[in-house]
Amino acid sequence: MVNSTILVTVVLVLALRALQWCSGYQHKFIDMIWCKPVALKLQGLIKKRRELHLAQQSTSAQDEYAKWTKLNRQIAQLDTQVKQTQEQLVENRKVGEKNLGKLRLVFFTAPLLVLRFWKGKLPVYALPSGMFPRVVESVLSQGWAAAALAPVRFVWASGTVKPMQVETPVCLAIWLWALSRVLDTSEFVVRSLCM
């Protein structure tokens, strides 16, 4: 059970990181899924406008005024259509970004949050006791709530001695936090070195 929980956690964290790394390509992904018909229509309109513009450039305004004016009107109409299609594409992108955000929440963020609360105190591995101060050991074994409750525990149990433990378990929530920090730091180092 512990191994499968750890495996699911690692897969979710890595998938979420991969999704964040690919966020630079988010507009292409959204265009491919939600905006393809509008993007194709816009591409066709721009191509047609370019052809008409080239035809207008090759036509002499003084010699063939009627043809040049007709092309000019067609270009003006295409400009308004291009502008409307671009506005429609922006609206579709906003809808796509909202939907992608919902998918990210449902498939990655929510399961990680559930794992943190439901299986947060599940021991992942153990460290030798006495390796860290008692406060740090309690955070490692019980999560971040132990750090917040440390003053209360100190006041309530001021005279009692904690029984000696051979090992200090590291809970899933702390392990997940440490994994996220390691990935964040590695990503920062790679981006810093590449720039």
Curated annotation (Swiss-Prot):
Recorded topology in the membrane: Multi-pass membrane protein
Gene3D superfamilies: Helix hairpin bin
Side of membrane Lumenal, spans: 1-6, 126-169
GO molecular function: protein-membrane adaptor activity
Cytoplasmic side: 24-104, 187-195
GO biological process: tail-anchored membrane protein insertion into ER membrane; vesicle-mediated transport
Endoplasmic reticulum among keywords: yes
GO cellular component, one term: Golgi membrane
InterPro entries: Get1, Get1_fungi, Helix_hairpin_bin_sf
Listed transmembrane segments: 7-23, 105-125, 170-186
Entry keyword Transport: yes
Subcellular location: Endoplasmic reticulum membrane; Golgi apparatus membrane
Main location, first listed in the record: endoplasmic reticulum
Keywords assigned: Coiled coil, Endoplasmic reticulum, ER-Golgi transport, Golgi apparatus, Membrane, Transmembrane, Transmembrane helix, Transport
Entry coiled-coil feature ranges: 67-94
Subunit text: Component of the Golgi to ER traffic (GET) complex, which is composed of GET1, GET2 and GET3. Within the complex, GET1 and GET2 form a heterotetramer which is stabilized by phosphatidylinositol binding and which binds to the GET3 homodimer.
Summary of the function given for this chain in its UniProt record: Required for the post-translational delivery of tail-anchored (TA) proteins to the endoplasmic reticulum. Together with GET2, acts as a membrane receptor for soluble GET3, which recognizes and selectively binds the transmembrane domain of TA proteins in the cytosol. The GET complex cooperates with the HDEL receptor ERD2 to mediate the ATP-dependent retrieval of resident ER proteins that contain a C-terminal H-D-E-L retention signal from the Golgi to the ER.
Family, similarity comment: Belongs to the WRB/GET1 family.
Name of the protein in question: Golgi to ER traffic protein 1
Native source species: Lachancea thermotolerans (strain ATCC 56472 / CBS 6340 / NRRL Y-8284)
Taxon lineage: Eukaryota, Fungi, Dikarya, Ascomycota, Saccharomycotina
